[in-house]
Amino acid sequence: MGEVSLIGITAILCQKTDGFWKNIDDSLCRLEVLKSNIDSKFRLVAISTDNRCIFNKWVRTNSEITKCSDLFLEIKQVSSQSSNVEYFGVNFAYKPEVDKFYACFSKCIETLQTQRRQSTLNIQALQINNELQQQLQQQQQLPPIDQLPPPPTSTSTSTISNANISISNSISYDSLHQMASGITLEDLPPPPPSASSLILNNNTPLDLTSLPPIDFSNLPPPPTGLMTSRSSLTEANGLEIKNKLSPLLNGGASGLSSSPPPTTESKNQLNSSSGSNNSSSAPHLTDLFLPTNNNNSSGNQSASNSSPTSQYHQSQPNLQQYGTAPLTASSKLLQQQQQQQQQQQQNIIMTTTTTTTTTINIKTGSSSDSFLKTASGRRSIRVRHSTNQAADQQKKTMGRKDGLAVSLQNVEGLQNIAENLEDETLNLLDLVNEQVVTPEISNNAHLNQSLMKIFEHLQVLFILTGQASTHPGGKLITQVVNKLGRGPQASEFFSGKSVDGGYQWYNLDEVKDSVIGIHNLLALKKNLITAIAHLSTCVRVLGLQASLEIDWMSRNKSSETEKIVVQLACLTRELISSMSRLLAATVTYCYVCSSIAFIRNQQHSASADHNQASIQNRIRSPSTIDTINIWDELKTIKTIPTVPKDGSILKVTLNQLVLMLTSETSYDSKFLKTFITTYQSFASPGVLFTKLIERFYVPEWYSTVPTKISTIQQKVIVVLKYWIENQSSDFDQDVIDQIYFFINNLANSNEGYSELSRLLRGLLDKMIQDREVKFELLFQMPPRISFEEDSILSPIELFSEWSAQSIAQQLTLIDFSIFKDLEARELLNQNFNKPKLKYKSPTIMRMISKSTQFSFWVAYVILMEPKKEKRIKIFEKFCEVGKYLLKMNNFNSLMGLNAGLNLTCVHRLKKTKKKLSSSAISILTELERIFSSKKSFKNYRDHLSTVQLPCIPYLGFNLTDITFIEEGNTDNISSTDPAAANIGPLINFKKRELLYQAWADLSRFQETPYTFQPEEPLNTFLLNFPILDDKELYDLSIALEPK
């Protein structure tokens, strides 16, 4: 069968299976579009460098081609018979070939679709017109088509048969021009959908014979799909339509658009939005079929200097020469668009809006700025500045020797992936925020769609970056690629089950099994909000780090390409892990909110006539002894207990503690502080408030003396005031409603408490206002970071670019921002040591996680450097960071640094440590002395007792002390008094005094903050670290210094 090659390009071919890309063959190939000389059929054939046919597919009529990046095209083909859909990806080695292949393949699709339409119209006409049926019978008497003489072919035509495949490397322009000269206006597709009618310029009929022949390069692009090619219109000497197939504009609409998909209105805006910074002119027929030429002609220069406005609007063919048809609404709209286009100034601001994101492109002269604005008003953390000169500088050619390093030439493709990854990560965070504001337990569609987009971006990224087979961490790349190939698993992202072991702070199964009552659900909801905010920060920072890493690599500033790819794999794995925890927390949060709403609806219907009784029943636990009224117990014990002066154990019930707290004869401020700080180890906030209300209403049998009753009631109000001021986080909405109910009754009474009730209401209103502000701040994005192109740093180069003092300062600021949120209730009942109760100690978990993560990051940065000289410098710089951390009294990060340097994988690097400077060795010796475990870390405790504030202690030692207190003292003591046998076990309040003292020793460090100022982007980068596990670090260590 005679075939002619329309175009040949150099690329790597991919195929999408189950939504994920996989290379058809890992080597570069020669991909050609072949056209049959007998009929208008086309097929794609790819021959590898060792002459293997790795791809041979017919081009189907139902085909689409989409730009995913400036060097990656996606081809979608649908079978007309079986409706099977196939996706093929073309990863180009040379940027100039992209637009040419796009135009050629689009023409093939248009030709096939035109043939189908003509065939359909002919069949319909034959069924109606008898004369045409007779003509058809006459035509059927003609000889078969295979007996007709074949058309003339050019000497340069390549012949492909089943036995032998031979593809030409160059095609004769003359022969192709002769073949294209037979195409008439009827071969053109109808106008685009937005130009549904003809626009007439004169009253003379159109003479089709006077039109010049149309070549391939002058045909319009395919219909608008997921990715729309922007076009510009020029008119000279008759009809001339030149389509400029523009690459993606950095920060603008992308081939892998943000999720959810844009609405109809948004798509219309997308079609008119900015599309490219590429100034190259439209490909002509000579450019389309001749070999690649990197020299810019004068014509290209002229096109690049044309008005920028034309690059921002999809072309609409000027059809006024076609006849005399009346103007329609669509035609008037087209004219208005053309007038608006003429009125555009040199400065252009175009906006592309989707459901949740808005990309704003600002063009000034030859440069353009872009930023992302989300539904929540957030702007992207990065601003990119680009110029038209960058596109010319990025046009590189590769020899066969450099073929396997094709990723380094995908400059714009990598930059677009970087932009898309950051945008979609921010979009995912927007969707999570929406779920927090309006939780829906079963609506995960948009979250799943956004997650799939992120996986697609990452998968295309590793297709572009290739492999790192010689780097010791190359196994990690294979692991990450396989994880991306499997795609996001619902059991990992949307079930709420435990992931990543110790880093999991919530568990949906635990919520289902052990949470009883609305109070516990409300407490869990509050903790989950904090966890979701923290995990959102992790996802944002990791997404930014990966994005900047890709962007930095695309500029080819380092010869250690494989090291960067391993870094990307590490960032990718950490990003996937953070997203899984974030989405699991979000699903858990939605479930908790649904359970709270269900319980409240039940209680509302059941307590219509007994509201106050229902509230008291709701906050009680029927399995505890606190159901005994405080006054009934006073009848039994006769007298109120007092705090022992000799330091002996105080053994009392909850009712007795409240009686002591509000005694009309004595007041002990230390006892009040100890009680309010530790009461949650034996009672909930709702139960305590109930006891205070019981105490407030004094029965007549106890006393009728107004002064005595007033003293008791004022003591209750003083306790309530101190509680609200110092432990505001204890109050959930259920308890707040009860307090407001009490305040209203107090204000309406005639007992002279109107001023006190006003004071309590003011405190409660302020507490709620502060809580709302804190909630908004949790999900408020920080100010964006502005990067110039030359100043964008790779996270892997972060440690070497910034000074040791700056790194220590930013670590200290981050640590203190976490430490200051620590609350006493997180230390109670050893919740931080119990897997199913860790969610009750979120700040402790964050502190532990931060210190552990920093330790592994220290080892990671050292072991990622394969050169010993550079590895020694990194080791010494970490020692210098430790020196500044010690000066700043940041023992949390200092302990993490010391632990990282003493991990087995680092400690065994004898050749590296042998070359350390004397100053580095002295710092290591000092750290070893301070954190020596002798005599229960006596050196550290002595040093901590002498430091001046501000200071951040290492939390692990405090938790150890609290664990000793918890395990060395019982919670309750059995009563030996037979008369008190019916009141149950007694609370060991001596244990609570010890816990309060431990908390007081720790909380004093929260009072004095640091005065350092955040430095960006260092502060943002240090919020989260990419790390490897123990085995991976040890494998790197063995590779660097074998046994």
From Swiss-Prot:
GO terms for biological process: Ras protein signal transduction. The gene is gefS. It comes from the Eukaryota. Residues 109-142, 404-434 form a coiled coil. Residues 803-1043 form the Ras-GEF domain. The keyword Coiled coil applies. The keyword Coiled coil applies. This is Ras guanine nucleotide exchange factor S.
